[in-house]
Amino acid sequence: MKAEAILRGAAPTYNTTALSLVNDLRTTRKAAPMTNLTLDDMLKERARELNWETTRRTDLIRFGKYEDAWGYKTDADKNKRIFPIPAAERILNPGLQQNFGY
């Protein structure tokens, strides 16, 4: 997350760069260091590093790629970026309105 924040324009701390942070991790994992880092590279690296951590959907939304076709998924409804509000919660708080599309 820190490398992504720096890559997106946040101020680095302790003279670190996004590339150096990712390469430190890759070195620990016995992977070859990268010479360049883009947001697409960062998304791919997060997919490898956080495999099975259930962060992929959120990452795809944050990187603006959730609606893209990939693998067996052909497209996605933009309304599905957010989840529905459970009926039990809406009963407890009548002021809540269901998210659009549900």
Question: Can you say where each PLM-predicted feature lies in the sequence?
Answer:
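Extended, hydrophobic/aromatic-rich amphipathic alpha-helical segments that build helical scaffolds
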Residues: M1-L25, L39-E53
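Long, intrinsically disordered, low-complexity segments
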Residues: M34-Y102
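A generic helix-loop boundary/linker signal
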Residues: N15, A32-P33
